């Protein structure tokens, strides 16, 4: 009899088998589910602390997604040969899992919860992210933790006008859409997508298609939970101090004072006024237990003020209605030495965005389970503490910065020129210099402007807008271009980026149990209106790409050579190509198909490198004169290097017009000479002549020599 009490559910989903199994691995975790989709397997575990840490006024949820190299039969690189810090993908998938599960934990639950998803097998066809999200939902559902799930998730593609459920990794490049949607039976909680300028209707259809298709997964999780779910945790009753403190605040008029403070339009002044009200409110309390619950109560009071005003009057914190976008100011070319730059300001949110162009040598090499590849477009988002008027830690980017940068990257990528027509590596850096909401979308707008300022031929400008939602019962209001407070106190963060023709990126996070198709449709339509308005403001600064790349950027010239000549251009151990780069100052990239990219800020340097390469691959032509260098002197002549790495022999009889006794009397190693191709011997070796070329002018004097010989011959004949 087995020592394991295994429970297993299996369904066919998207043409592949999905298996949920628990009871064999990681049995000491509160919940552990092994998910297998195709031959991709992910172990998802959940552990909750049995008690709440004192003084915690937030929900401490941590999600760690990790990919093990052995899952794809690989050994990690590097000196230590083991997995190290999380990769960008691991960070992004961790956020992808966190976002739909966080709002489903019971209000007031403050125990620490840790989710760990470990990729144990990867078939290189089914991306582990969907399996990890499904497994996390299943593990939480059976754990007994106060999780109001389960959650389902699916990836949606769009090929030839039809939606595709969970497209294979190899099929995604053919898809016009890569969308991940997660939600409950009732509605959608999270969307993350990249699209090739698709309409709002197509995007909404994809979301609802995914929602329908993952219902089978939710049912499988429910069936598993009915067999093996642990007893639900007992939630502690709200402390008695909550009612006491709420009463004290109401009696002291704190809600009314907060309402007055939130009428101040300027962010810093408003924060100061709100802070003063909170300080005054806390002074009413003397007991430690009362102070411990005061923060949460004040936040609820703030939310009631902000949300109530919007739903009742349609007027927001800064005086706008629900559809108005803040004032926009655009400047381009703000940094004199940068290849492209833009300062994008929208209200109190500002991004300084800089584009830099490089060569193939600057591409980022990314090593993933699916294999190594090179990325020629990078977008990095930085959020320094001064942008919100604070002093804080500076260091490597956090999860939020990585996620925001990737969202802007997704928004821009569908509109970038093909690598074949624009062979530059592009790096965009967005420095957030002021922030009051929608900084990631400001990064999209600034990136579009900076790239066009750098001369990157974008077919159309790209803009982004962040939408919000206030929902109470059946009443709701969709907000365009949300402020930071509207994000924190609202029910939705819905970001849409795209061109005048369609959507390129969409990200949605819901903080309530779910939203309906009706709300999403209104939000998408309102976002389109806002995006078109923003594009119009951007066009006032720059409406199309510069005619050429910046004068500070390298100029890349592409030439092609026969593949069999690549070895000659590179040389033994890279000797030849290194010499070309060192002598000319140009950068050279050689592809396996014989495509060569020569880059240099100095056009003359690039041309010298091109001429050198063409000389190497050119075949010597009979009767043509070339410049060369003597590389070896022997008794019977001199070997001369010409046409790059090609050598030929100048026989001693072809060194000079007069008779030569010793080769060294005429040339020495290192001499620069002019030679004419006389022909080729049986082995393909080149026969050269110096005497048939005027070494000063480079002119062909063979006719003159022939005439002299003929005259000399006639003279001898006459004498005879």
Swiss-Prot record:
GO terms for biological process: mRNA catabolic process; RNA processing. GO terms for cellular component: cytosol. The keyword Metal-binding applies. Residues 623-691 form the S1 motif domain. Pfam families: KH_1, PNPase, RNase_PH, RNase_PH_C, S1. Residues 695-720 are annotated as: Disordered. Disulfide bonds: none annotated. It comes from the Bacteria. Involved in mRNA degradation. Catalyzes the phosphorolysis of single-stranded polyribonucleotides processively in the 3'- to 5'-direction. Belongs to the polyribonucleotide nucleotidyltransferase family. This is Polyribonucleotide nucleotidyltransferase. The gene is pnp.
